[in-house]
Each structure stands twice: as structure tokens, then as C-alpha cells.
């Protein structure tokens, strides 16, 4: 089973543009044999998702756009995983939309409703199967790893925390060389894919560097830092694939990452002469 990580940068609030880009990435990934496509967590919700959930028509417009994508890519026989914030029992919930067979399903909230009782079991990461590979989607490594069901083959981790100079793990692949993330894969004997965003959202910046670890904790695929990329990797349990050596991995240097993060922020943030309030501010519910 081939997994695709679409490390793309889009402007927050451009629902039509984001949906069009997801469709384009799905078709490109399909050409390379991918069965599952992941896109970055902030695409639809930025770094502060709660505010968008309260914006009038935002959730409706997002679901309508994604439904159109799901219908148009149905012929590809792919699954797209699109993180998004939704309203659940009166509160914003960090969820992910599963685009499959022409439909859009909010996976976490749908399964939470089925599970009923409000406890840790209710929020254990849902697991789905693609070509015999059991995949669990997680957003919070500290909390959700402890609730991970048995029998998972692949953890698809969507980075949500923006770049922080004091936390090298927010630099994704650049932290692996110093040991970050490896134990998650090797200790549990699972493949680990990190979908790292790139670009500026709200007041935050992401520096890219998506990657895939095999079930021994070795890096078998990496995307570049600070730029867009479509990373496609075959997931094969029990098969020893070629891996990258440590010297082939980027090394986190705080000064370099700070500079590149500033470059991304300047590039993605409108200048004072064209700055406008985000489109949803004028439509936010009281």
C-alpha cells in the first residue's frame, strides 16, 4: 500500500483553492500508485481552529467543497485524509474528513457518537484498513499514543504544533537525526508517517520536512524542509527497505530554522498595504 503526504501551502480561507489543490494532489499521487493521500492539518483551520468553527457557513462551505472533491476523485479509488475542525456536542473538535467512494465522513466525531460514553475509550484513535494495512490517525503524540489500539500497522501523525525554536520536534525530519520519533516506531513495531505542514497560518509558521519511518525506526522517505513536496512511500510490514543514513538527514540548527521560518512568514503574510481582516471575521457568530 502506497501512502502519499502532500506537503502543500495554501492561503487560509480559500476553500475553493484548497479543494482544487487537494484534487490535483490526489491525481498526482494516484499516478504514482498511492492509495491514501494525507494533507496538512492547518489547511482548513489554521493554527487556531476554534474560531473557524464559529464562523457562519464555514463548516457548510468546507463540507460542500470537499464533497465535490470526493465525487470527482471517486474514479481514482483513493482515500483522502483531510484534517478539519468541526462542531461536536457544542464544542470545536479536531477531526479529520475521510474522502472515500464519493463521500465525506468526519471520522473521529462519527466513531465517537457510535462509542457513546464520554471516556478515554471514546476518543481512542479510529483505525481503518487499506489493502491490509491498518492505519491510525493521530494529532497529539503525548495523549493519543497511550490510547492506540493493538494491531495498528501505520501511525499517520498530523503535526499541528507550529515551529518552536525550543522544541526541535516541531522541525519534523530535522529532529529525527537526534533521536526524535524513532522510538515511537521501533518500540511499537509500527510504521510512522509524519505529515508536516509548510508555510504561515494565522500567527504561526510551519517548516515542512514530512517523513516516513519503517517499523524499525529507520527513515525510508523524507520531504524537503521549507518548501512544497509530494512524498509517496510504499508501506510494507516485515520488509526491509533501503533507508537513509543519519548523515543524509537534515540537522536542526536553530538559527537556520529561525531564518527560514521568517522567510516563510514574510512570503505568506500580506503586506500592510494589502492586509485585510480574515474573511470569516465579518461573518462570525456572536
Where are these regions (language model features)?
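Active-site beta-strand/loop signature of hydrolases that rely on acidic residues for catalysis
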Residues: 18, 28-55, 80-81, 152-160, ...
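N-terminal glycine-/serine-/threonine-rich phosphate-binding loop
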Residues: 1-36, 264
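Conserved hydrophobic/aromatic positions in well-ordered beta-strands
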Residues: 4, 97-99, 211, 231-233
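Non-catalytic positions within long, well-ordered alpha-helices that form the structural scaffold/packing
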Residues: 27-30, 148-149, 271
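CN hydrolase (nitrilase-like) catalytic-core segments centered on the catalytic cysteine
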Residues: 59-81, 143-229
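Flexible inter-domain linker/hinge segments
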Residues: 132, 137, 242-265
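A phosphate-binding catalytic loop at a beta-strand-loop-alpha-helix junction
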Residues: 262-264, 268-286
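Active-site catalytic loop in hydrolytic enzyme cores
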Residues: 64, 88-158, 163-179, 226, ...
